């Protein structure tokens, strides 16, 4: 097992609604500050650190475009993936997303950890579902989508962040 306390690291993230930034903050608070080479948003610059914590938001079952671009440029890095998705409640769903994301990672890299949790969505999403329900021939699963939206409102919560911190500590 490599020692994450001794190695220099960078934390790069894309966060559309602030959910993934919460995860990034939790990682930053957990690791030794003096070993941090970079903490901030992903501007697609390849970090110098050997260890990279890469955070994304989910877009159509994969990481956002900016994150995928960065991942495809990384070589010989130790990568810890973390992300949020509006739809939650199923580890299998998160596994599927992470599987997609990992296809953009070069074989010279090692994925040393991965974590995903649900993240709240903008109110406009719920409003759209409610509007769609008013149509006579609406999708049958709208009630489920609205229930999922409401469940997501509290996430990432303390439990989500604690679980991530535990993984990062190793």
Predicted segments — roles?
Residues 1-3:
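Short, Lys/Arg-enriched N-terminal segments with co-localized hydrophobic residues
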Residues 5-7, 30-34, 49-54, 59-170:
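FMN-binding flavodoxin-like domain, especially the glycine-rich phosphate-binding loop
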Residues 5-30:
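N-terminal beta1-alpha1 ligand-phosphate binding loop
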Residues 37-48:
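Short acidic low-complexity segments
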């Amino acid at each position: 097992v490599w020692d994450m306390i001794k190695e220099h690291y960078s934390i790069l993230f894309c966060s559309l609604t602030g959910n993934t930034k919460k995860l990034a903050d939790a990682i930053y608070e957990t690791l030794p500050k003096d070993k941090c080479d970079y903490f901030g948003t992903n501007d697609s610059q390849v970090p110098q650190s050997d260890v990279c914590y890469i955070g994304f938001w989910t877009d159509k079952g994969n990481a956002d475009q900016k994150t995928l671009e960065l991942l495809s440029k990384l070589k010989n890095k130790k990568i810890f993936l973390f992300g949020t998705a509006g739809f939650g409640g199923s580890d299998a769903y998160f596994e599927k997303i992470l599987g997609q994301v990992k296809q953009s990672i070069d074989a010279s890299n090692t994925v040393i950890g991965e974590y995903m949790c649900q993240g709240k969505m903008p109110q406009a999403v719920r409003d759209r579902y409610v509007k769609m329900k008013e149509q006579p021939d609406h999708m049958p699963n709208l009630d489920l989508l609205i229930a999922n939206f409401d469940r997501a409102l509290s996430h990432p919560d303390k439990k989500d962040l604690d679980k991530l911190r535990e993984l990062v500590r190793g």
